[in-house]
Amino acid sequence: MNTVVGRRIINGRRRPRRQTRRAQRPQPVVVVQTSRATQRRPRRRRRGNNRTGRTVPTRGAGSSETFVFSKDNLAGSSSGAITFGPSLSDCPAFSNGMLKAYHEYKISMVILEFVSEASSQNSGSIAYELDPHCKLNSLSSTINKFGITKPGKRAFTASYINGTEWHDVAEDQFRILYKGNGSSSIAGSFRITIKCQFHNPKYVDEEPGPSPGPSPSPQPTPQKKYRFIVYTGVPVTRIMAQSTDDAISLYDMPSQRFRYIEDENMNWTNLDSRWYSQNSLKAIPMIIVPVPQGEWTVEISMEGYQPTSSTTDPNKDKQDGLIAYNDDLSEGWNVGIYNNVEITNNKADNTLKYGHPDMELNGCHFNQGQCLERDGDLTCHIKTTGDNASFFVVGPAVQKQSKYNYAVSYGAWTDRMMEIGMIAIALDEQGSSGSVKTERPKRVGHSMAVSTWETIKLPEKGNSEGYETSQRQDSKTPPTASGGSDTLDVEEGGLPLPVEEEIPDFVGDNPWSDLSTKNSQEEEAMSSESGLRPQLKPPGLPKPQPIRTIRNFDPTPDLVEAWRPDVNPGYSKADVAAATIIAGGSIKDGRSMIDKRNKAVLDGRKSWGSSLASSLTGGTLKASAKSEKLAKLTTSERARYERIKRQQGSTRASEFLESLLAGEDPDSRF
């Protein structure tokens, strides 16, 4: 049996045998990471039947990038340097972008191209120099140049720019320096292309999200409320007086009742007061004013007038006279630092008003330079420096001598209330940037006394605590031991003690002031119910005081004239003032004449004894003939003699003295 095997023939050719495909070995794939955040993730290939499960090997990842940037607005005279590396601020994509994603980098090529923007009429060039190691700070060679009127181009390969080695991303690779020699007009710009390779990537934080929107506008700060404070009141003190021929005695100053106004609200407050300084002739009042924390412009208006009034019924609080001021230009209204304040821009103007020589008050005339009023206007800037801040105000001195005493005579020592004057103090916080002095016209009838820019120093501790002083008074003045009154021992007949005497050391600038101090035990409250009756200090022995001996007799003219009336040159200070007014002279002319009068009074001491044969008898100066006559008078006769001399003149007083010594009755003529 024949077997026929048929072979399939297609297109005349025998069908090829089916062959099994050989499994192909997969080729290794290199995975390269780039900095493109939007790179599409490669699609995963399906695993074939014959594919092995081996891992695809990879090499160290890297990247190569090209950056193009420009340096614009180059003038023909521009100079500078372009540093390639992390300092390349002209290309943030390179310095703040790619360098932060890798550990190492190298720039393999740089193309420096000059783009001209100058006109054909301009001249000059821009020289450039390559510094491959970043060691130059300025251009050192001008071999390579670009003309500013035409473009230019220069390329540097890796070997020129230190680009064959890898560099840490924290260090710069090279630098190009340039400098032009043209004008200051715009010449063109640099267009720079760099090719850079990056090596060894590192983890970088994701890009920060969008910045938050603008914060809501803050609420407006509430406007500061400035304060305005006013103190206003009339300080008072208690005095003791007998007649207009005697000196007065002063008690310690009580606390003063002032009206306090703030933000249109009014109440009452007490201000501490005391004598700033005190001696046998005068005492200076002082009032302490508290200041709230802050900076203040302070304005003070002061009207000094010292009326006296009775303290008992039926004429209680009715004026019965006054205590006059002197015309000393060195005294007046002023302020000083008391505690935790700074005072600047101080300006104080003081004025005074003389009494007319023909005016008579309680039988006395104003013919010795007495003043009725002493006013002042003051502005300053005060800044507090701590808690319990305060400053003080001082006024003109209260004169104790009989020539300034115009209180009514009762024939016995009587207490009276005396006003210091009206004081208004305004503290303005809104004007705290500084005090501006407003020039004010002086009051009609007032004479300008003095303007000062200096503040008063804080008194010594003893001065601010009270006083027990000794004062020379008239022969009728009784000795007192409390309330700050004044005493002085005199010889029989009203003559002073010998020149050599022991007195306490003084405190302060005035050798007659601040003889001793003592703090009052209680302050007196001022109120309508109290009736202004301060409590007197209990009597007691004075404390021992340090003493010193004065051997140099150098008194003031007023003191010499009070002790020895015979040295009067024949005219008074009031006569000088009247003559100056009649002649139309100035205050300066009047003061010069008064100085001449004072010199004549002091020169009158020469008549107390011969200049060649002067001697001391019993420790005192030898009295003149007239003084010996006056020593023979009784106390009442001497007081009457002084009153006649003050009211009618020295001639009438001498006639009265002679009639007394002759044994005649002078009542019919005097």
Curated annotation (Swiss-Prot):
Region (Readthrough domain (RTD)): 204-670
Biased composition regions of type Low complexity, renumbered to the chain: 25-36, 50-60, 609-624
GO MF terms, alphabetically ordered: structural molecule activity
Biased composition annotated in UniProt, kind: Pro residues: 209-221, 536-545
Keyword annotations of the record: Capsid protein, Host cell junction, Host periplasm, RNA suppression of termination, Virion
Biased composition (Polar residues): 466-485
GO CC annotation: host cell periplasmic space; host cell plasmodesma; viral capsid
Region (Disordered): 1-64, 203-223, 431-553, 609-629, 641-670
One Pfam family it belongs to: Luteo_coat
Site description Cleavage, residues in chain: K437, T438
Annotated Basic residues bias: 10-24, 38-49
Family note: Belongs to the luteoviruses readthrough protein family.
Protein name as it appears in the record: Readthrough protein P3-RTD
